[in-house]
Every structure is written in structure tokens, then in C-alpha cells.
């Protein structure tokens, strides 16, 4: 059975007595940090930041990494495109304010990468996001293999150990 409350989602582990401990992601779990200003125009009729803005914040942070040639070398005939985006909304964000987006690569494949991100307001995680990003050949509009130097650079933004040596390649899911 799924948990009815999205606020309970996050990283879980068992304590020695078998009970569940909720451990949400921390900004320190992500090698890339991006700050975005929340605008009045970002609010919805409920007075909080619109869910579409969560996706825009993730996109801006993704592009800060993927479109910066000092970080990620790119072939001139290719570009990154998003193939999938999932967002788990864990809490509200409000204007005025700042949101910090933590980003990392969790897997680098032949022509794509899996990126996970989290949005933080005042140290509290408001959302987790996972995206699949594909390198596309501009001429054929089809997936293209990642060049070795691009793969190597992307791996530099992969998940750091979480303290016990395990990679942070999880994706929080509700229990069944």
C-alpha cells in the first residue's frame, strides 16, 4: 500500500530495531549547486510557487551544467535533449525567496545520462527530480554516442558516497 502523504517520501533506511527512519536528501549530496530567485510571477492561485516553476528550476540547473563548455565538452553537431522528467513534490515553496537546486549525474550511458536533482528552500527539500537526458545528433535528430571526453566530464558530476560508501543512486519511491 502506498503512503498517502507525499511529504513522507524520501530516503529511508531501517534502524537497528527495524523501524523506518526518514532521511531526506541534503544539498551536500549533490556536486553542483544552483540558486534561483523565486518571483511573484511564479506564484499560482493558491499563493505558492507553481509546480511548473519546479520544472523550470530543474531545467535551469541542468542547463547550467550541460551547456557550459568549461564543464562539459560537447561536439558541435550535437545537443542534449530531455527525454523524461519526473518530479516528486515534497513541500511548498513561497515567494519571496531563493531556491537552491542540487544536481548530479547518477548514471552515464552510451548516449544518455540519468540526472537527479533536489530543490531546497531554507535547507528543506521541497522536491526531488529525475531526468533522462540524451545526446542528439543535430542533423539526424537521433541519439548520438557520448564522446569519451564528455563521458569523463559527466562522471565528474556523479554522486558522491553517502557516508557509508554506497552511491546515492536511489530514487525515492513510496512503499507498496
Per-segment meaning from a language model:
Residues 2-102, 106-176:
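Terminal targeting signals and extreme-terminal segments of soluble enzymes
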Amino acid at each position: 500500500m502506498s503512503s498517502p502523504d507525499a511529504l513522507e517520501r524520501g530516503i529511508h533506511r531501517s534502524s537497528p530495531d527495524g523501524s523506518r527512519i526518514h532521511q531526506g536528501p541534503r544539498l551536500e549530496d549533490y556536486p553542483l549547486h544552483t540558486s534561483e530567485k523565486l518571483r511573484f510571477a511564479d506564484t499560482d492561485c493558491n499563493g505558492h510557487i507553481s509546480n511548473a516553476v519546479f520544472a523550470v528550476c530543474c531545467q535551469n540547473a541542468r542547463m547550467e551544467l550541460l551547456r557550459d563548455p568549461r564543464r562539459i565538452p560537447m561536439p558541435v553537431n550535437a545537443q542534449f535533449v530531455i527525454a523524461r522528467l519526473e518530479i516528486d513534490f515534497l513541500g511548498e515553496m513561497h515567494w519571496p525567496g531563493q531556491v537552491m537546486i542540487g544536481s548530479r549525474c547518477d548514471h552515464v550511458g552510451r548516449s544518455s545520462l540519468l540526472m537527479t536533482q533536489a530543490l531546497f528552500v531554507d535547507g528543506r527539500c521541497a522536491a526531488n527530480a529525475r531526468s533522462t537526458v540524451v545526446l542528439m545528433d543535430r542533423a539526424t535528430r537521433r541519439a548520438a554516442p557520448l564522446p569519451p571526453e564528455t563521458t569523463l566530464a559527466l562522471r565528474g558530476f556523479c554522486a558522491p558516497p553517502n557516508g557509508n560508501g554506497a552511491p546515492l543512486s536511489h530514487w525515492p519511491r513510496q512503499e507498496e
